[in-house]
Structures are given as C-alpha cells and as structure tokens.
Curated annotation (Swiss-Prot):
GO CC annotations on file: cytosolic large ribosomal subunit
Originating species: Syntrophobacter fumaroxidans (strain DSM 10017 / MPOB)
Family matches, as InterPro entries: Ribosomal_bL12, Ribosomal_bL12_C, Ribosomal_bL12_C/ClpS-like, Ribosomal_bL12_oligo, Ribosomal_bL12_oligo_N_sf
UniProt name for this protein: Large ribosomal subunit protein bL12
Summary of the function given for this chain in its UniProt record: Forms part of the ribosomal stalk which helps the ribosome interact with GTP-bound translation factors. Is thus essential for accurate translation.
GO molecular function, one term: structural constituent of ribosome
Keyword set, alphabetical order: Ribonucleoprotein, Ribosomal protein
Superkingdom per UniProt: Bacteria
Length: 127
C-alpha cells in the first residue's frame, strides 16, 4: 500500500469541480461532526460573551482639571497643597488643561479633591 502525501491530496482537490468540492465539504462535515461555518460564528462569540460578563466596579480614580475660572491663583494654591508640587509645576499643570491632578486614588479621596478644586474655582472631572 502506497502512502498519500498532503501534496497528493492538494493536487487531487485542485482538479475537482465546484460541485464536487461542495459535496466533499458536506461529507467531511457529516463524517467529523464539524461545520465549515464554525470559525466565523466563533469569531463573533467573544463580543457577545464580553457583553454578558458582569462589569467590574472601578476602584481607582483620577482627578482631572478641565478648566480654570477667574480664580487661577486659588486653583494653583490648591493644586500645590494637594500634590506637593512646586509653584512652577503647579502653575504649568493648571495652565495646560486638561491635566491630571492625582491618579489611582480611592473614590472618596477623589471626590474630596474634586470638591476642594471646585471650591477654588476649577472645573473638575473624576475619571
């Protein structure tokens, strides 16, 4: 009995008609219990699975200055007090909005910082 290589199989398939190829695919699907369309369906599954997964609650927040009102000096003072930055660094942060004041902090601390900055005259977002 001679062995058949992959190359022999490929050459044989190349000589088949479209109808014969279709019948071959159907026969392979039945014999091995697979579907030729499965990879396409499987590619779409992760998107649905991701939507069904429960959303994890965010535990770390960032405080971002999005705008500075008329009280720029007060905002700079608050940024210095909150971040322990020097005067020049705090001024640069306030002038280059949006700017992250603090990141990776708990929600209650982020809310307290946002309140301080808002009272000083800044527009703030918690992300």
């Amino acid at each position: 009995m001679s062995t058949i290589s992959k190359e022999d199989v490929i050459k044989f398939i190349e000589n088949m008609t479209v109808l014969e190829l279709s019948e071959l695919v159907k026969e392979l699907e039945e014999r091995f219990g697979v579907s030729a369309a499965a990879p396409v369906a499987m590619a779409a599954m992760p998107a649905g699975a991701a939507e069904a997964a429960p959303v994890a609650e965010q535990t770390e927040f960032s405080v971002v200055i999005t705008g500075v009102g008329d009280k720029k000096i007060q905002v700079i003072k608050e940024v210095r007090a909150i971040t322990n930055l020097g005067l020049k660094e705090a001024k640069d942060l306030v002038e280059k909005v949006p700017g992250v004041v603090k990141e990776a902090i708990p929600k209650d601390e982020a809310e307290a910082i946002a309140k301080q900055l808002t009272e000083a005259g800044a527009t703030v977002e918690i992300k």
